[in-house]
Curated annotation (Swiss-Prot):
InterPro entries in alphabetical order: 6-PGluconate_DH-like_C_sf, KARI, KARI_C, KARI_N, KARI_prok, NAD(P)-bd_dom_sf
Residues noted as binding Mg(2+) 2 in the record, renumbered to the chain: D192, E228, E232
Residue positions binding NADP(+): Y26, G27, S28, Q29, R49, S52, S54, D84, Q85, Y86, Q87, G135
Protein name (database record): Ketol-acid reductoisomerase (NADP(+)) 2
Signal peptide span: none
Pathway annotation: Amino-acid biosynthesis; L-isoleucine biosynthesis; L-isoleucine from 2-oxobutanoate: step 2/4; Amino-acid biosynthesis; L-valine biosynthesis; L-valine from pyruvate: step 2/4
Organism: Bifidobacterium longum (strain NCC 2705)
Alphabetic keyword roster: Amino-acid biosynthesis, Branched-chain amino acid biosynthesis, Magnesium, Metal-binding, NADP, Oxidoreductase
Molecular function as annotated in GO: ketol-acid reductoisomerase activity; magnesium ion binding; NADP binding
Example of a GO biological process term: isoleucine biosynthetic process
Length: 350
């Protein structure tokens, strides 16, 4: 069955006439959503704690900023863009008591709705607009007249108007320039977590670092090992992004292709481990483990962060990256990223 995909012609921004959208959080996604919607003509207010370091930053961008409860109280749509582990507490304390009758709740990830940490009453529309890219790219693409694709879903539709609202939000974000794919909160949550854990982060990160270890332990220069197992990865990903895995393969030598086809690193046992990880995501085991750890002060999370904060390939990575002339040419983007990291590194109401 073909996926349902919507584009700009399929949404109408007049849905927002006379409505106000509250963006809770001003981190990676929060700043992009607030600025893009504002620049699309939507009435936006940013909800932050008065003591948040992001208050002045958001005001510098010309945005209206209010305490979370006040922002929620005057909004017709409330987009919650906080880290998963903080959403339920903020919802209970600041959102639920102040939510206008019939106001819509929106999310960029289905975690808290899917696993039941947030349970809105049935009279509130609930939808999701989840960009398939980090916030600074969502903003940069919008400013360039392009967009980052999104997946969209509706969980509760009490008035029959939630889909038009959801698509209008995606259009205001700039996402319908690229396209919005219909999904569900369940599908988005489970596939997103799986992709992170088994391929994009839990797969590639470990594979690259282990490859670096194998080569350097065998006596090869760390600089050469870095190039072979990490630096070239971006080029292959760019090719795959343009034309799929086949284009990436066809762009490499016959020798490289043969080595790809005959490799024994990824096996049926790997698939079984991935299926086990998916099961833990589906039955809620992973979510419970993560949320329980966070509730206890995140001791395991902090220990793991420290344990993995010094990947072996980064013993030479910074020096090599500083040598690349194109990195100097991209200094503007680097400065933007550093500014983001320094000012709004965490998407939470501080």
């Amino acid at each position: 069955m073909a996926a349902t995909i919507w584009y700009e012609k399929d949404a109408d921004l007049s849905v927002f006439d006379g409505k106000k959208v509250a963006i809770l959080g001003y981190g990676s996604q929060g700043h992009a959503h607030a600025l893009n919607l504002r620049d699309s003509g939507v009435d936006v207010v940013v909800g932050l704690r008065p003591t948040s370091k992001s208050v002045e930053f958001a005001k510098e961008q010309g945005l209206e900023v209010k305490p979370v409860g006040e922002a929620v109280a005057e909004a017709d749509v409330v987009m919650i863009l906080l880290p998963d582990q903080y959403q339920a507490a903020v919802y209970k304390k600041d959102v639920e008591p102040n939510l206008k009758p019939g106001a819509a709740l929106a999310f960029a990830h289905g975690f808290n709705i899917h696993y039941g940490y947030i349970k809105p009453s049935e009279d509130h529309p609930v939808f999701m607009v989840a960009p398939k890219g980090p916030g600074h790219i969502v903003r940069r693409e919008y400013a360039a007249g392009r967009g980052v694709p999104v997946v969209v879903a509706v969980e509760q539709d009490p008035d029959g108007k939630t889909w038009p609202l959801c698509l209008a939000y995606a259009k205001a974000l700039g996402a319908l320039r690229a396209g919005a794919i219909k999904t569900t909160f369940t599908e988005e949550t489970e596939t997103d977590l799986f992709g992170e854990q088994d391929v994009l982060m839990g797969g590639i990160n470990h594979l690259c670092d282990l490859g670096f270890d194998v080569l350097t332990e065998a006596g090869y220069q760390p600089e050469i090992a870095y190039f072979e197992v990490f630096h070239e990865l971006k080029m292959l990903v760019d090719l795959a992004n343009e034309g799929g895995l086949n284009k990436a393969r066809w762009s490499c030598s016959d020798t490289a292709q043969y080595g790809d086809y005959t490799s024994t690193v990824i096996t049926e046992e790997t698939k079984k481990r991935m299926q086990y990880q998916l099961k833990r995501i589906q039955d809620g085991s992973f979510a419970k483990e993560f949320m329980d750890d966070q509730a206890a002060g995140a001791p395991k999370f902090k220990k793991l962060q420290e344990e993995y904060s010094h990947p072996h390939l980064e013993t030479v990575g910074p020096k090599l990256r500083a040598m690349f002339s194109w990195n100097n040419a991209e200094a503007k983007d680097k400065d933007e990223t550093e500014s983001f990291n320094g000012k709004i590194a965490r998407t939470q109401v501080q």
